[in-house]
Amino acid sequence: MDDIFTQCREGNAVAVRLWLDNTENDLNQGDDHGFSPLHWACREGRSAVVEMLIMRGARINVMNRGDDTPLHLAASHGHRDIVQKLLQYKADINAVNEHGNVPLHYACFWGQDQVAEDLVANGALVSICNKYGEMPVDKAKPPLRELLRERAEKMGQNLNRIPYKDTFWKGTTRTRPRNGTLNKHSGIDFKQLNFLAKLNENHSGELWKGRWQGNDIVVKMLKVRDWSTRKSRDFNEECPRLRIFSHPNVLPVLGACQSPPAPHPTLITHWMPYGSLYNVLHEGTNFVVDQSQAVKFALDMARGMAFLHTLEPLIPRHALNSRSVMIDEDMTARISMADVKFSFQCPGRMYAPAWVAPEALQKKPEDTNRRSADMWSFAVLLWELVTREVPFADLSNMEIGMKVALEGLRPTIPPGISPHVCKLMKICMNEDPAKRPKFDMIVPILEKMQDK
């Protein structure tokens, strides 16, 4: 089968769907020129493929090597329906490429009059200069130039030249497609790993920042007592299910090193510059999580969990909490598969009871409805996002576990929280597990909250 980039270019929707259904495929990877599958589908006008990629979570504002977004390509090739679709999904209408051109520069230059009108109607700036001091309207033929100026003025735009600044995108994050070769290696040679700095050490092992094949990675070395052939076999069998590349809100395990030859069983995953949601909320990173960012994180997590809940069988021993959610370079929250416990890791022990549903603390895993229990954990994450506090921070894990399970200890919702979030939290934290919603039911609610 041809590669995914060819299938997207040619509009082979059936082949693209089959490729997307394989969880080991990463739809946000790039080719040699940094074109993602979405870039190619937008450039060639493949509407059905564009729709499919967006619905599966393709990044809308991803940039190729020349900093063109999919909107730049759709606009320059006059694919009006695709331009509309990208704008509907919040494409950055004034995204600047390496020459300082925005999508409107290209629509004007290539004579895509209708696309240019659509862009201006949606807020594209007619007077923004590129690196060479040219405005989009400078590129347009005279009749279109006058029309666009008139439209922009009606919409309240100031028609004075906006000089090019190298800082146009400084407040935003530039998202590049990921290296597509990373998901090809499941077994990794331990000797190829370059260890740069130890990040953390706890009961379950050591966490290191490293490099592998020119990429920044995180290396997780598991501490396992009495390593045996049987545990080694379980490790080999359980690892492949954690290599989920097909959803943007799930962070896959890239690969693993068996022990021996590695000193310990080892997992490799993508380096996340902001660390975990716990780091971002409680350990003073550089950016502020305002209400709209909090809703976006909640939506990201709900989408990731909705996807994981479609898998049959469910991935066992996955615990949802703020330490097991990672924050990507473009502020996307991703459920970390490297935090899933293996069958041989401390069975029966709970290390983050503050996020665990009461029934999961009281019963054996096989007697608990995992999907409902995950929804409770999500409600605690919502509480954490709006309060910026660690749940039950003044108690030990042992006390939390006992009090939540036996004494009805619950997070208290402080006054002043948005009534919508408050209501959602209460629904997700219903004492009756059977009455809690499913993740695919709360995704649309969070989408509405985001739009507001």
From Swiss-Prot:
Domain of life: Eukaryota
GO process terms (BP): branching involved in ureteric bud morphogenesis; caveola assembly; cell differentiation; cell morphogenesis; cell projection organization; cell-matrix adhesion; establishment or maintenance of epithelial cell apical/basal polarity; fibroblast migration
ANK repeats: 2-30, 31-63, 64-96, 97-129, 130-174
Annotated Protein kinase domain residues: 193-446
Modified-residue entries (N-acetylmethionine), positions: 1
Binding site for ATP: 200, 202-204, 270, 272, 279, 341
Membrane topology field: Peripheral membrane protein
UniProt record similarity statement: Belongs to the protein kinase superfamily. TKL Ser/Thr protein kinase family.
Protein name in the entry: Scaffold protein ILK
Organism: Bos taurus
The encoding gene: ILK
